[in-house]
Amino acid sequence: GPAFQDSIEIGTPGKGGAIKVYGDFGLPEEFEKRIRDAVRLRKMTVDLMEGS
C-alpha cells in the first residue's frame, strides 16, 4: 500500500492495547474510515482476549 506519513495513536498499551493508524490528513474521509476500522478491530481483539 501507499506509504502514509501522517498517523494517530489511540489507546494505551495497558488498557486494551494501543493502535497507531496511518493515513493522509489531506484525505480526512479516508483517514476517518481507517480510524473507525482500526478501533472496531481493536475492540474485537479485546473481546476475544477477554473471552466475550
Mark where each language-model region is.
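Compositionally biased, non-globular sequence tracts
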Residues: 1-52
